[in-house]
Amino acid sequence: MAVQKILINQFLQLAALHPVLDVRSPGEYLHAHIPGAYSLPLFTDEERKVVGTAYKQQSRKKAIKIGLDYFGIKMRSMVEEVEAMLIDLRSLAKKQLSTNNDQPTNNIILVHCWRGGMRSAGVAWLLDLYGFKVFTLSGGYKMYRQWARSQFDTFWPLTILGGYTGSGKTLVLQELERTGQSIIDLEGLANHKGSAFGALGEKRQPTQEMFENLLAKKLHLFSETGTTHGGEIFIEDESQRIGALNIPDSFWKQMRRSRVLFLDIPFEERLSYLTEEYGIFGKEPMENAIIRIQKRLGGLETKMAINYLQENNHRECFRILLKYYDKYYEKGLAARETIPVLIKKITCLEVETKSNIQKLMHEKITAP
């Protein structure tokens, strides 16, 4: 068998069926990688640094010799690691009793490094020699990043799910997905709910690059399978910044030009929902979050909110915060183009997911 170098589109098609091995260093992988790829580093972070220094300060041949020293002692363990991985994947597929062709049924392996150079070529040679059928990505991870960024420039049929803070928009999105609708949960991809309090109860945020990769993969799934229910993708209304991350500029501009179905829920109902959702968190992280917005909230309101928090009067604390976020959200709505055309308000009596979805879908069908 011979190693085949393939272009990004074919690589992604095969990646839906077969494992992808990222042979870059652990640090490179940790920073960002192709979603779903497995880390099989040819060099450790320190070894990569040594090889790179030799290449720059001595010669290409010297760097290759140092790399071969590192590679030689790892050959057997790398082959065995890939063998074990394939066994685990096949076992998992059998347990899931999948009837689709979405599990590896042979020895096909996809390999990539940063630019599709010597690291992927070396590992691909080894795995091919052992008996695996190996494909490498032309241009490597760098080419994948170019492809990922191109996804954000593509037109997508977005419908924005709007509503003031505390409207339960994420719950609506999740229920829409369970019923077969196409959705993108940006806050889920970002591990952040979007406000100063958005990190509470969430895992650490991915890097900006990894966030973009995750979003690109989600979009690519829609282009591969075709969106359902009229080719519509529901996505929650967001500011461009979600915690420490930014929605890619071209995609965010598409969001701002898309129509909005706005869940208009009474203030007190939303306040009750927020009190229940955030009242479980400790005083210290809540106070830290309040302090982060004190300049915009104002000194008096900040002091009052913290006092209510210390007195365990969460409802009055959140009342102050919710008024602030309502004003903040209204400014964002006002900045949209052709507001009367883009925004359709849907009157809802409470934060109740299923009944609000019924109203949402009715408006979606009847709206021009």
Predicted feature descriptions by range:
Residues E47-A84:
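Aromatic- and Gly/Pro-rich amphipathic surface segment
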Residues F132-R145, D185-A190:
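A short glycine-rich beta-strand->turn/loop micro-motif centered on a GG-aromatic cluster
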Residues R178-K253:
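Conserved nucleotide-sensing/catalytic segment adjacent to the nucleotide-binding pocket
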Residues M1-P35, A63, R149-D153, L158-G162:
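Flexible, polar/low-complexity N-terminal or interdomain linker segments that lie immediately upstream
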Residues G117-R119, T159-R178:
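Glycine-rich phosphate-binding P-loop
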Residues K253-V260, D264-P368:
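Conserved NTP phosphate-binding and transfer environment spanning the P-loop NTPase/kinase superfamily
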Residues V20-R24, A37-L40, I184-D185, F234:
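Short hydrophobic beta-strand that contains or immediately precedes a catalytic carboxylate
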